[in-house]
Amino acid sequence: MLGALSALAKTTWDVIVVGGGNAALCAAIEAAEAGARVLLLEGAPRAYRGGNSRHTRNFRCMHQGPMSVLTGTYDEDEYFRDLMLVTKGQTDKHLARMTIRASESCLPWMERHGVKFQPSLSGTLSLSRTNAFFLGGGKALLNAYYNTASDLGVTIVYEAKVTDVLLAGNTCRAVRVFMDRQEVEIAGKAVVLASGGFESDIDWLARAWGPAARNFLIRGTPYNRGEVLKVMLDAGAQSIGDPTQCHCVAIDGRAPKYDGGIVTRIDCVPFSVVLNKHGERFYNEGEDLWPKRYAIWGRLVAAQPDQIAYAIIDSKSIDLFMPSIFPPVKADTIAELAEMLGIPAESAERTIAQFNAACRPGNFHPTELDGLATKGLEPPKTNWARPIDTPPFYGYPLRPGVTFTYLGLKVDETARVSGPGGPYANIWAAGEIMAGSILGQGYLAGFGMTIGTVFGRIAGREAAAHVN
């Protein structure tokens, strides 16, 4: 290993890519195809390579007509409206529209580089017009990209933790890497930072969120601790985004602290009544279609006492959503279910009785906004409001599940990172480490992959062009 380390350190690479997920691989592939000599440094072991991309399912894509597995049309303006709705306008509109437009050419590019897509999934994640789902999920996408990168001659090193970005003025001269129990400096003519956010650093989360963050679960990789982001911010790089903003969904409270992935997400919320630990409802469970609302529920649960809540359904709804990896808690009565979940039984019974009394007759359509709403209830439920009255009853404990954070590095449309006195000469960024440039708050299903793919490709091309 010492010989390999020495060889890495003695080589001045054309492009060094820091990170090993979707954005990093897109950058490495584009740079290598442009003729650059590329080194990719992945901090995780090979078995855990890929950051949060290991857990992804789909890619949101603009298209003017049917394309590959996508149906119908999803044009720039509709895509942009969807983004504005979830971000409440907290976005760089120029970069957002640029990303949306660029997404159209990404899907065929992905297919050319080995990514395969599947027909759209059924149930609440049916997004055949807007999102293309990966056949085999995120790991299959990563395997395809790693194979492509290797075939192109990219040098890939695992368990290579970048601890510093060494600057001379506005230029990066090298990165400091901890590997094989020692630190080495590796020089590069251009650097792409694609190492993710800081969501796995609980202390950093707690500085932003307060003590409540200690109860959060990190459904993404445990390797995204924000070291590269921190050294860049400490060096004066311009930041973008709010440290309290993140992609945070409601996941099963029984999930592990780290790396539970997308299979821990609870998708029954639109068909449920959600109670806090006191047995009280606190938000409209049927506000909108689930793909447009699932990403707000982590923050909603985070605001509840002890950062926990409980989704309760009855037997009418058990087959309407994609199940979590954990089976629901099951009981024949609401009181029994409440006791099993740890909710005051009397309060839970009262809340659900009030909800049931507020439900009105009408046509129920689980895959579209059906207007089946409660009357005289606060908070209301404005769609899919059916009485919870048919045993057996089922419950899931909910916790905030953080996927990635939005505080990041400010970039321009060429993915170049902004320093204290203007753009750095040879530093680009892609993926979660710069996603706050576009995602000021909220989330749109599949859009993180869009940002990573678009800006990864741009960063790789620009870095290679700088060298050439």
Language model features with spans:
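Glycine-rich loop(s) and the adjacent beta-strand/alpha-helix scaffold that form part
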Residues: 182, 186-252, 449, 458, ...
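A glycine-rich dinucleotide-binding beta-alpha-beta segment and adjacent secondary-structure elements
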Residues: 347-441
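Conserved N-terminal/central alpha/beta ligand/cofactor-binding core
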Residues: 37, 43-155, 159, 272-281, ...
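Beta1/beta-strand and adjacent pyrophosphate-binding region of the FAD-binding site
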Residues: 8-23, 39
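An anion/pyrophosphate-binding glycine-rich loop and adjacent beta-alpha core
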Residues: 225, 229-349
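A conserved short coil-to-beta-strand element within the FAD-binding core of flavoproteins
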Residues: 158-171
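Core beta-strand elements of the Rossmann-like FAD/NAD(P) dinucleotide-binding domain
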Residues: 10-13, 180-190, 423
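Extreme N-terminal leader/targeting segments of oxidoreductases
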Residues: 1-15, 33, 438, 442, ...
